Amino acid sequence: MIRKTRTLALAGALVGAMISLTACGGGVSDAPAAGDTPAGEFTPATSGEMTLYTWSDYFPEDLAKKFTKDTGIKLTVDYYDSNETLEAKLRASNGTGYDVVVPSDYMVQTLISANLLKEIDAAALPNGKNIEQNFLNVYFDEGRKYSVPYLYGTTGYMYDTAKTKKQLTSWADYFNPPAELGKVGTMSDQTEVVGAALRSVGGKTCDTDPAKLQAAQDLLTTFKPRVSTINSDGILDRMVAGEESIAMMWNGAAMRAREKKSTLKFVYPTEGMALWQDNFTVPVGAKNVPQALTFLNWMMDPANSAAAANFQRYGSGIAGASDLLDADMKASPEIIIPEGYTGAKPVVPCTNEELTNYTQIWESFKG
């Protein structure tokens, strides 16, 4: 789905920047039908059960039902609110308790390093040839040995234009919004919130400059009294209901919110924003591996991937899915990055020292 055109979920060049940190490339051929690829040694499971652990409101209920109907496998879905919550859960359980989990790009690399993910060789599965070439050799999992691409997008913020005459354009505006917008919603996500604060004060992701780190902490301390909730769950619903008039949001959720309330506007901050990709992986202690692999293969069918993308309003890393996207997605201001905007940058993993800095700022902010 990566083409040099603005009719895609994200501008192709920016997606290439996100996933090409290890210099991948090449064109994209038409996706084959789901059953065209020889299965080799892979035998799909036709019964049993499995548990998917994913972000809140991030896997369509109708798609879960279709998976069970198509495969005979009962699917149970459980939810978390941040990559850090997922990591803590897997570390505490030694990778047990779930069959498929959905970490973001940098967290895939972290979990691989911690020996918490099972090697699956996604490209060798029957539908593995459907993985977009630009999504195959990614910096966090070269050759897709541990992960399958799910959806990708950006993190900015949204505000209600009916509540203020001011045009908000930056993270500085988000952290110090007009009084008439009231309380502010923010995510329960250390990487996103601290990263945005660092950008706002002229810093960068994984910054080690003591002055920038202190400035980010001071900014969040000043920001805290304006905060309504620190919760990634329910942001869309709170914005639509008017419980919050400004909140940090992912672009797909922002599109869904605007579809329900037309006065909501998504902002591409002038200081830059996170460009991320989420992925299906199998924890090392998964009990139902045949069912998990069947799920991964099923989700690499373009029709199933597109169904998720259309519901969630994000881009897909599966070839052929873009042809099945809803027309409104291809023209959405939340999905199509504005002409000339170059601030969307990939989230890369921080070192342990850098993570310690993030954690200290985050814990101070949460209080």
Located regions from the model:
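A ligand-binding cleft/hinge motif common to bilobed small-molecule-binding domains
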Residues: 107-110, 245-263
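Extracytoplasmic ligand-binding site segments that recognize negatively charged/polar headgroups
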Residues: 54, 58-60, 85, 97-98, ...
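C-terminal motif of bacterial Sec signal peptides marking the signal peptidase cleavage site
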Residues: 19-23
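Mature extracytoplasmic/periplasmic domains
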Residues: 283-342
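Ligand-binding "clamshell"
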Residues: 112-119, 141-144, 257-268, 330-331
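Conserved C-terminal helix/tail region of periplasmic/extracytoplasmic solute-binding proteins
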Residues: 339-367
